Structures are given as structure tokens and as C-alpha cells.
Amino acid sequence: MPARAAAPLPMLLALGLAATNAPAGEALLPAPAAAARQEALPPIRHVFVLLLENQSYGVTFGSPSPASYLARALPARGALLTQYYAIGHASLGNYIALISGQAPNLATQLDCSTYADFRASAASLDRHGQLHGSGCIYPRSVPSLPDQLETAGFTWRAYMEDMGKNPAREPATCGHVPPGAAETTSVASAGDQYAAKHNPFVYFHSIIDDQVRCDTHVVNLERLPQDLASVSMTANYSFITPNLCSDGHDVHCIDGRTGGLPAIDQFLRRWVPLIEASPAFVADGLLIITFDESDGAGAEGSSACCAEKALPGARFQPGFSGPGGGRIGAIVLSKFVRPGTVSTVPYNHYSLLRTVEAIFGLPYLGYAAEQDLRTFGADVFSAAQPTG
């Protein structure tokens, strides 16, 4: 799956419509909002997003931290975004927002204990790019970042640790239970700690209904070293999900390891150097490491930034007791980032989606298109860039 260069301008101009072509029998939703202004960004062509679990900023980056590699070593090599926020509770709504701009609904707030189709209460997206209703698997007509990337000629791949280690639990690629079935992967099992609720790609019919497409793009994490071996094999966009122990979700892991932040540090010490040493990352790469949500404790745990909006008609705020998912922080690594950078500019998961879309010249989806939202700017990409 070779990486691609930038798509020609006519293709990008057509993308808003091309990404929303609905099959027969489904409503054709309006095109996603176009990028109203193109913020100046470095010439990044390989983006890696690595998502961890359930930690508040103060615990992760405070002193002392149970994760010295994450909290101290990595910020010294890149940028620490001190005002980066999750957009809700619990996990799944945050993951889905990162690749679609869709706000949490009651089903995704409850992590979709049943893998059920989204039940829309409106025929089309509203003016903010939101599909009203509730449910888990979004209809084919709801655009996602993978749809955008492919239409524009870019490549993507999602890497899921442990997926398929127990074939009776889920397949080794495109791992999910049958639509309509009870979700059986939310709790770790012996030998297989994959959780579908941490894999947003299997919550879009446009991906799971094309088995070859899904099997090709949603794979086990052990595939990553092979793909990192050359620029041509490395996807333009890579999404990395550790298992329920390695991502810090479980405090006491089923395999006997200590979970939480110590497990996160152990995972990062293995995988971050592999990514940083890869030819694609060295050439023009960007790695963002953040969490899905805070630990949810108190008002801080459900705080928000960036004038975040709820899904219209939703029964609860995105954070249940508050407007967001709490302050979590983020690490950004790239040759375009000056080591030791600290940014105090507010960002959230919609900001990250917007930044990825801006990097690849794509329209902004859902709440990533809000006028008050900004992409990562010079506060993050602070390293001097070549002039020619």
C-alpha cells in the first residue's frame, strides 16, 4: 500500500461530493464543509496517531509521573500540548470524533454494548455536519477521514494490538462482532486484549461493508514494522491502538502485568523509536500521542475547550456531567517541531482531525469545520523549515 503524493486540485475540489456518494436506498447527505482557510502547515506527508486510554493531564504529566518516558523524555524531543482536551465520555465517542467529526450520541457514550446500526432521526447532516440520532455503526453516507484520504489519492491503515489473537473472539483483520450482536470484546480475555470500542474504523458501514477494503486497512499491530521498512509501504495516515493493558485502560491486566501509565510507558518505549527511525517519519512524518479521555473524575474530568458543541437533541452533554472529556494533553513529534516546545493553545480531538485534513488538503468533517476551531499552528510546528 504505497504512500501517495498530494492529489491534484480538481480532485480536491470534487472531494466534498465524491466522499458522500450514497448507495441506492440511502439518503445522500450534504458534502462536508470545505476548508475555509488553509493554515500554513509544514510539508508533512506521513501522519501517525497513537491513542492511549483514560488519564488526566495532571496525573500523566505531573511530578512525579508514573510514566517518565511519556511525561519527560518525549516532550523533550518534541512538543507538549498542555491544553489538549478530549471531547466526551466514554471511549468510543472520542475515537469516532477523531476520524469523522461526529459528536458523541448516547450509544457511543455508553461504548455500544450492542453493535447496532445508527438510527437517524433526520434525513441528512445538519449545517454543522452532524447526523442526528443514536447508534453505533454509521450509514455509508456519513463521510469519514479514510473516505476522504482514498478519494484524494492518499493511503491509510489502522493497527490494532492483539486483534485476532483469539480467532473465536474476532477476526485478525477488520475485527468486529456481527452487526446487531452483543459486543464481546470490551473486556480483555486471556491471550487477546483487543477492544473494538477502541477501533473507530469498524463503526462505519462504508468500511466494514467492503470486506476486502476493511481487511486490507484494519490490521494487527504486528504488521507495522513491515510497513515502516520503506516510504512506499508506509501509509500516509496510520492510526495505532494498543491493547487494553498497553493503552493504560486496565489497571490490573489479565496477563499479570501492571497496567495504567507504567504499561503505557512500556509500550511507547518499544514502538515510538521504531516509528521515529522509519524512512517515512524521518522524511516528512508527524506522530501525535494522546488519550481518548480523562479519568472522568469531577468537573475537571468532563471539562472542554474550543467552544465544543454537543450533538443537537442529545439526552446528555458529551461528558455526561460536563461539556467534554477533560484535559488530557498531547505529545507531538516531528522534525518540524522544535524539541522542548510547550504549547498552551487550547485544542481537542476535533482540532486534531482538522489538522490532519488540512495537512492533506481535505475538507473539514463535522465539528472539525467549526469556525472557532483551529489547526495546530506555529505554536506546535516551531522548527525552522527549509526555504528551498
What is each PLM-predicted segment?
Residues 1-9:
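Bacterial N-terminal signal peptides that target proteins for export
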Residues 25-388:
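N-terminal pro-sequences and low-complexity stem/linker regions of secreted or lumenal proteins
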Residues 8-18:
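Bacterial N-terminal signal peptides
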